[in-house]
């Protein structure tokens, strides 16, 4: 679905196509779909059992319809895509320099202008809400607890099951967004179909599909 949106944007944007090089644009292959915009690349992969996509690397991961992705495949395969730094060699050099400077008592001034470039790899979990027992709901609750902790060590220790909080953990790097039907721009969805669903389907299913709520069975 995401790749189809990319194709639509590309096909309907003549100015975008004009400012991109000849290698840019969407491409569908047997085992993947790739969208290139100059030096940037988006790769869409079919998960399967996870074996054929092992070893992939990514700066940013979007796991769409997360409730339908087997938890073990996400945690053992997909999440590992972002385990390596976006520029591992430069990152190793920078950390080594900072460590040595600290030993020598030399202060290294932060480069505020490059804060966006220094951001760690990102993972986005998205999709339609599902039942409360699903791992999507589990992740949502965990991330919400992290955000509500406001960095309090005691509360974070509870989130981590009583274990110490990792040294490089930053609660500010987590966010959650809930977008129910009522917050969408008017006309974005067929209002009559939404009304029909609200009148005919189970309230729990309606809340999952249109209310962005995890439902208990």
Question: Which positions does each model-derived feature cover?
Answer:
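Residues immediately C-terminal
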Residues: 49, 68-69
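Walker B catalytic acidic pair
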Residues: 62-65
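Non-catalytic, compositionally simple segments
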Residues: 21, 72-217
């Amino acid at each position: 679905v995401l790749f189809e949106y990319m194709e639509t944007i590309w096909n309907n944007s003549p100015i975008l196509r004009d400012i991109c090089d000849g290698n840019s644009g969407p491409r569908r292959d047997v085992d993947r779909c790739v969208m290139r915009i100059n030096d940037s690349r988006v790769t869409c992969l079919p998960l399967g059992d996870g074996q054929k996509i092992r070893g992939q690397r990514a700066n940013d991961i979007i796991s769409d319809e997360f409730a339908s992705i087997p938890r073990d495949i996400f945690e053992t395969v997909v999440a590992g895509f972002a385990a390596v730094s976006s520029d591992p060699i430069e990152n190793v050099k920078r950390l080594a320099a900072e460590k040595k400077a600290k030993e020598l008592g030399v202060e290294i001034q932060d480069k505020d202008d490059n804060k966006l470039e220094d951001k760690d790899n990102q993972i986005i979990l998205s999709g339609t809400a599902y039942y409360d027992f699903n791992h999507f709901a589990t992740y949502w609750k965990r991330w919400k607890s992290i955000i509500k902790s406001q960095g309090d060590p005691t509360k974070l220790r509870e989130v981590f099951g009583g274990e110490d909080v990792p040294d490089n953990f930053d609660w500010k790097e987590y966010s959650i967004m809930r977008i129910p039907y009522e917050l969408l721009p008017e006309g974005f969805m067929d209002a009559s179909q939404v009304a029909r669903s609200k009148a005919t389907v189970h309230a729990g299913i309606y809340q999952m599909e249109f209310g962005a709520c995890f439902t208990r069975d």
